[in-house]
Design a protein with these regions (language model features):
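Conserved PLP-enzyme active-site core in the AAT-like
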Residues: 1-81, 148, 163, 167, ...
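Active-site C-terminal subdomain of aminotransferase-like
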Residues: 38-147, 151-154
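Conserved C-terminal alpha-helix-loop-beta "cap" of PLP-dependent enzymes
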Residues: 123-210
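C-terminal alpha-helix
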Residues: 214-218
Length: 220
């Protein structure tokens, strides 16, 4: 793509970055992601925390929406300090031409994410990522052992994966599983009964095993 004069952007699951190489290691130009899962609650679609990063390119940075906070050192103590940078992009200078007008201000989600990551620390973040990967692959393996079920359909994967539940319909699978206390993921395709399954750090091994037993019962 670069040889043809194009730019490369990649979307990432930020929680996977504790166990896989970060995008900066494979020469992409832009990285996008969703930070809602960094200490924020699943609030039925909002407020959310968008993540956007680029290589250092002054032209690109000037065009990025939102306010930019830069890291520097305090003048007297030389301690780390942070301030809004490139302020010529801002509303109080450029008014209606400001690029920070493009996005909404949902700073509380960014504060939550900062607190969450600070509380985890580097080691905690790696352990969280590894735990999610382990749960996802364990559940995919258990579901794949059920007759008529194919899991995972696509590899490699981190913690979310697609399952083909066979001849059952989406409506019947949802109804029967929900009645038993489980949501069987979300519809992935109208072809067959393919659904996207996700795990989280709140799911214990017992939870995953119980879900497998429910699926077995429903598919009998």
């Amino acid at each position: 793509i670069h040889e043809a004069g194009g730019l490369v952007s990649v979307g990432v699951d930020v929680l996977s970055l504790g166990v896989i190489k970060p995008p900066g290691n494979y020469d992409v130009d832009f990285v996008i992601g969703e930070g809602q899962l960094l200490g924020n609650v699943p609030a039925a679609g909002g407020p959310l925390l968008g993540i956007l990063a680029s290589k250092y390119n002054r032209k690109w940075i000037q065009a990025i929406p939102g306010r930019l906070v830069g890291a520097t050192n305090e003048m007297n103590s030389n301690s780390p300090g942070y301030c809004i940078t490139l302020q010529t992009r801002e509303q109080h200078i450029r008014r209606e031409k400001a690029t920070s007008n493009i996005c909404t201000n949902e700073s509380i989600t960014a504060v939550n994410a900062a607190i969450y990551m600070a509380a985890l620390g580097k080691r905690g973040f790696v352990e969280l990522s590894q735990g999610l990967a382990d749960r996802g692959h364990y559940l995919a393996g258990r579901l794949g052992e059920i007759d008529g079920v194919s899991a995972p359909l696509y590899q490699p994967f981190f913690s979310d994966f697609v399952v083909d539940f066979g001849n059952i319909t989406h409506d019947v699978l949802e109804k029967e599983c929900i009645e038993r206390g489980f949501v069987p993921g979300i519809k992935f395709s109208d072809e067959g009964c393919k659904r996207l399954i996700a795990v989280s750090d709140l799911h214990s091994k017992e939870d995953l095993d119980n879900f497998v037993n429910v699926v077995k019962e429903v598919l009998q």
